[in-house]
Design a protein with these regions (language model features):
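N-terminal helical cap/lid subdomain that shapes the substrate entry/recognition surface
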Residues: 1-98, 107
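Asp-based, Mg2+/Mn2+-dependent phosphohydrolase catalytic module
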Residues: 4-9, 25-32, 102, 106-109, ...
Length: 226
């Protein structure tokens, strides 16, 4: 439903926004030192996340970066929270809603379906803000974000948590996603039916094959019974 414009300036501009906030609030290091330290911390966190499928909040990344640079700010400090907000503000510039997303959710609600979102993201509050900004939040019964429950897709725990919040069994649910390893495999492993939005040509093995493949979100309405 939500896509990110991953152009060449995306990551760098988000990081510069964090640095600008920190520089204006007493953190006296060069951008080069900050960037190098941040990228090292991020790499270490990503490696742990990929092994454990646990999702720490983005503020952990900021706090650990600052501590390595000699500034003892924990995740609850106003400085770390402000840096996270700076990141979020810049990030929002690169997010856009999939065409017809609101209409699809509205039609599904009219047909009597409960809907939810499972998102792998380290800034939960930003996800809520984005969903609200694009008029999607009011059509969702459940919103599950990895950093809120410290589990990320394809961990079965995050899918089961969402199912429990919706009050449905896996066999009654359909999961729609655009990645095989994260979305489709994870949902299949807990017994959900799956729909792959194939945004680009994908080599699909028999063990990863979704129940349905569509080209755009609006095609989902041709699959879901009236």
């Amino acid at each position: 439903m939500l896509l990110i414009r991953l152009d060449k300036d995306f990551s760098e501009n988000c990081l510069r926004s964090v640095y600008s906030f920190l520089s204006a609030n007493g953190v006296n290091v060069s951008y080069e030192d900050f960037r190098r330290t941040y990228l090292t911390v991020r790499k270490e966190i990503y490696e742990r996340v990929n092994r454990s499928l646990e999702e720490p909040h983005f503020s952990v990344r900021v706090s650990q970066t600052l501590m390595r640079l000699g500034y003892n700010y924990d995740v609850s400090s106003p400085i770390v929270r402000g840096a996270t907000d700076a990141y979020s503000g810049e990030f929002m510039r690169y997010v856009y809603s999939e065409e017809d997303a609101v209409r699809v959710l509205q039609v599904l609600r009219e047909r009597g379906y409960r809907t939810g979102v499972i998102s792998n993201f380290s800034v939960p509050e930003l996800v809520y803000k984005i969903l609200a900004a694009y008029g999607l939040k009011d059509f969702l019964d459940v919103i599950v974000i990895s950093a809120e429950i410290n589990r990320r897709k394809p961990s079965p725990e995050i899918f089961r948590f969402a199912l429990s919040q919706l009050g449905v069994d896996a066999s009654e649910a359909i999961f729609v996603g655009d990645t095989l390893d994260t979305d489709i495999k994870g949902a299949k492993n807990v017994g959900m039916r799956t729909v792959l939005i194939e945004r680009k040509k994908t080599n699909i093995g028999p063990e990863d094959k979704p129940d349905f493949t569509i080209k755009r979100l609006s095609d989902l309405l041709n699959i879901i019974p009236i």
